[in-house]
Amino acid sequence: MRIETAIKHLESDADFLGMEFFDFIAFVKENPMAQTRKTIEAYAIFAIESKRAWDKVA
């Protein structure tokens, strides 16, 4: 899964639950067992790519 696809999936799940994107990211991090396998996969890719992007800044 590409980062663009991962973000789209996470955004659609957040919209479905009526949550803001970063609130949903925190929710997934705290409650991974309440998510689908695809959401966990998308979150993992988002987390890896976010860390990689911030490592370039620091």
Region annotations inferred by a language model:
Residues T5-A58:
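Acidic, low-complexity, intrinsically disordered interaction modules
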